[in-house]
Amino acid sequence: APFILFVRAKPRIKDFMSEAENHMIEAPEALPQVQNLDEIHPDQNPSAYNESSIQILEGLEAVRKRPGMYIGDTADGSGLHHLVYEVVDNSIDEALAGFATHIEVTIHTDNSVSVVDDGRGIPSAIKWDDKHDPKRSAAEIALTELHAGGKFDNNGYKISGGLHGVGVSCVNALSSWLRLTVRRDGEARFLEFRKGLVQNRIVEQLPNPLTGKLENVSPMKLLGPTNRRGTEVHFLPDLTIFEKVTQFSYDTLLSRLRELSFL
């Protein structure tokens, strides 16, 4: 069955897109000559590449440190709008798999964007094989780990539009705040993040069904019963990341989403 994809703005936001300025860099006439490389001590050479140059970035640190590697240009607006496409791609995959018929994208007056679908909802139960302490919900892992999701095991999605870069975890990392609401199995559950970090974490002890031992777990906040299903992602881009173009363009999103609705 065909699915419906809506785009709306509150109110309509003007397109502030502008072309990025071109910058020319003059090459030096001649490169400096080094007589003996052995004479340069690594600690005294600012361009030295050695073991101290290798950094280990945990979680979503890498995305915030080098956002352009994950979403493209953060100055010309393409990276900003790519955040929306990453979230929408997940909803479209639910539609391609036959589980969603409706996707709604809203630009809010504060320049935040929400994407709501009526798919199965991101799994919200505790992932008992999680190595983290406390053990986290599957939804939290999907939003805070770069290479986590439901498209790696060949079971969750028999049909998929692809992995779509690094998905919603990248959006989470580059947002001032992100609010996730999952409606699944008759319950609505909620998580809030700021710059990729979960807020107001709930920690309790439950018996691990795999081992029988009591373990610390961090479930999503229970909002209550619901007869709806699906995933809602509402986020506000972090303007310390995005430089010149900081407002979403209704026309840019409309054009892209109109194309996607026919694919």
State each model region's role:
Residues 1-16:
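Short, Lys/Arg-enriched N-terminal segments with co-localized hydrophobic residues
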Residues 16-53, 111-138, 149-263:
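GHKL-type ATPase core
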Residues 50-64, 75-86:
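N-terminal amphipathic, basic-rich helices that act as targeting or association modules
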Residues 67-75, 151-152:
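Structural recognition of short helix-loop-helix hairpins that underlie histone-fold modules
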Residues 77-101, 167-174:
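Conserved ATP-binding N-box helix of the HATPase_c
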Residues 101-107:
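A conserved short beta-strand within the histidine kinase catalytic ATPase domain
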Residues 142:
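Short basic (Lys/Arg) and small-residue
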Residues 145-146:
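Mobile ATP-lid/nucleotide-binding loop of the nucleotide-binding subdomain
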